[in-house]
Amino acid sequence: MFVLSIALLSCTTLCAATTEWWGDLRAHLNPARQAPFYDVTYDEKVNVCPQGLHADAIPEYVYFGTMLATMTVDEHDQCLQKCAEKPRCKAVNFFHPFAYQEKGFCELLTEGQLDNPSLMRPFRKATYYEKIRCRELDDVEDVEEAAPIGSEITEKLPEDMAREKKLDMSKLMKKLSAKVKEFNGGAGGFRAAR
């Protein structure tokens, strides 16, 4: 009995256990089903942001941080609008309504994922929004404005592109045939199975 208790005591001193949340270290093993995206909403009823709202969205994730307020809303843009009206609001969790529900659930947050990234967790039927702001006219850029003035953009003709592909393909075939000859000819080639 004494030997058994000493063995158990020595085993417990060597073993250590920790508890980790799913999102802390293994979140990369469960990638989001949808990629993050930019969200732009328009609401003609509210004059706070006449050009609409602009936000960064991360679907199927929520932030479990300090909440400013909670409410039920019909659409996610109402949730974003409430956040834009409150200066302390930095981010929003929007929980989409289930089949039996008519309204979604909104959480206004006083901090975001950049404040504490470990508080981001995967969560189905929810979307995390951050960087919520009024959309400015400068947010929309034309293609001509995006290119620098001094840069020269030249487009290749389809004939040139086809010719380059043929040249690349012929170079590849030459290299491949040289490697096959080297493999077959050098070092005895293939050996018969014994």
From Swiss-Prot:
Residues 49-134 form the PAN domain. InterPro entries: Pan_app (IPR003609). Residues 1-15 form the signal peptide. SMART domains: PAN_AP. It holds the Pfam family PAN_1. Keywords: Disulfide bond, Signal. The keyword Disulfide bond applies. It comes from the Eukaryota. Disulfide bonds join 49-134, 79-106. SUPFAM superfamilies: Hairpin loop containing domain-like. This is Uncharacterized protein B0361.9. It comes from Caenorhabditis elegans.
